[in-house]
Regions:
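Histidine- and/or cysteine-centered catalytic micro-motif in compact active-site loops
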Residues: 47-49, 75-76, 190
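Long C-terminal interaction/binding lobes of large macromolecular proteins
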Residues: 68-167, 178-179, 184-187
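Extended interfacial segments that mediate partner engagement and assembly in macromolecular machines
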Residues: 1-65
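N-terminal J-domain/J-like co-chaperone modules of DnaJ/Hsp40 proteins
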Residues: 163-213, 217, 223-243
């Protein structure tokens, strides 16, 4: 298991414990089993390796038969598309879109902090518009069931878990601008974007505005603004105060 995944697992457990919802819990590396005070049981997997449709069905079948709700959370940098991508779903994504109300979950790590967020697969068919949601509120963890009737391979009623309301695919609630809004704007991002979105935007803008590649006389100044915004946002995600 990667060190970052260990950090994410530790952060996940502590965050759920802090809600007061957990009665008992057990962890085994990237797998975390919680019994909630509501009586529900949730098994969360932090996924850092390729997951096949057969793997998904195995976990869903085994856990559902035991009355345990399953939640997969994926290493975002490796497995999940960037925000606003128009993306042809891989087989495992399409399978989870079918059973999880067109929602995946991702995690990112910065320093000793970890961040968990939904990834919405907007649209219909195999090609979807990707939309990263706001960071999850651990107090909203819940179990629910999803019945699949139209897909023979996935047919059945599955015990699942997620954050927020049972119907996840909805726009995030409006909120006031944060003090970091101007730095997100420099990178061409909406306020409070995810760390993954920040990294992707920085890489794209660095390729476009780096003085070694861009002959524009203002490229050096623009690149300095981009670097400053990126460093301040990273400092925020890592839990330090930027100067």
């Amino acid at each position: 298991m990667r060190y970052d995944t260990f950090v994410a697992a530790e952060h996940y457990v502590l965050s759920l414990q802090a809600t007061g919802m957990v009665e008992t819990w057990y962890t085994d590396g990237d797998m975390m089993h919680f019994k909630l005070k509501s009586g529900e049981e949730v098994l969360t997997y932090l996924i850092e390796y390729p997951l096949s449709v057969q793997n998904i069905l195995h976990h869903l079948t085994t856990n559902t038969q035991k009355g345990i709700s399953t939640l997969f959370i994926f290493w975002a940098d490796m497995f999940l598309p960037a925000h606003d991508d128009l993306y042809p779903l891989e087989d495992w994504m399409e399978a989870l879109a079918t059973v999880q109300e067109n929602t995946l979950y991702g995690f990112e790590v910065a320093g000793r902090n970890a961040f968990f967020f939904p990834v919405y697969l907007d649209g219909v068919g195999r090609v979807r518009r990707i939309r990263h949601g706001e960071l999850v509120d651990f107090r909203t963890l819940h179990a629910y069931s999803s019945e699949v009737k139209h897909d023979d391979a996935l047919r059945g009623r599955w015990a699942l878990a997620g954050f927020g309301t049972p119907t996840q695919a909805r726009p995030p609630a409006p909120r006031k601008a944060t003090p970091l809004a101007k730095f997100y704007a420099v990178l061409g991002l909406p306020d409070a974007s995810t760390l993954l979105a920040v990294k992707v935007a920085y890489r794209q803008m660095a390729r476009e505005y780096h003085p070694d590649r861009n002959p524009d006389p203002h490229a050096h100044q623009r690149m300095a603004q981009i670097n400053d915004a990126y460093e301040r946002l990273l400092a925020y995600y890592e839990g330090y105060d930027a100067p």
